[in-house]
Structure formats: C-alpha cells, structure tokens
C-alpha cells in the first residue's frame, strides 16, 4: 500500500501570511487555496472567517507538500502551541484509510469520524499518545 505523508499546520488566522512567507523561501506555486467561503456549508460564519484559509498546500521540492488551515474560534477550535499541527496521511483507498483510522485512533480521541466531505473521504483524531492525525482520500483517488 502506498501512503503519502505530509505535515499539516494550524494557524491563528494568519495562514495566508505564513504561506506567502514559505512560498518566498521554497518557491513554486500553491497547489490549492481553499477559503472557508468555498465550503457550501459555511453557513452563518462572519465575513472575516469566510475569508480565512480552510486549506492551502505548497509543494516542496522532493515530492513533499506543506499544508495548513486557519483554526477558527467560531468553530470551537482553540489553537495552542503543541496542537498546531497534524500528520496528514493520504492512502490510496477508502479501505486503507479506514484501516489506518481504526488502528491509529484506538485508545485515542476522535475529532471527526471518516466521512464523505465535498473534497473527499476524510477523518481526524489524536492517537493515545496525543499525536494528531488526518486521513484523506481525495475524490480523484480510487474508492
């Protein structure tokens, strides 16, 4: 089974600023920039929060990808140094994602069960050691 692993960072409303800085250092172009307003379910968010970064990805030479989001207090997310990153795994299949989710989350704290989102199949949790993980099978990957 092939699994892609990338760091996923959380910022306190300054993801765009941080990633423009990282882009100036690493070069290249953003693979994706998704704002909260792009989510069809953003609902009653403030206009400020709608403009925040929901997901951004910057390819790094060598095949890696640096990714991030803005943590929003309006969504109950409280950012603190130590919880400001996830390890993001992108297995090739839903079955692979389900297997990794079940194994790694055993004894941990599930933040979001594996579920279909508008961009793909996604779930996140902290394992029993407090390490935060995200699993994602994109819509363009096999089921």
Locate the predicted segments by residue.
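Glyoxalase I/VOC metalloenzyme domain signal
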Residues: 1-115, 124-143
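Short, small/polar residue-rich loop motifs at catalytic or cofactor-binding pockets
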Residues: 118-120
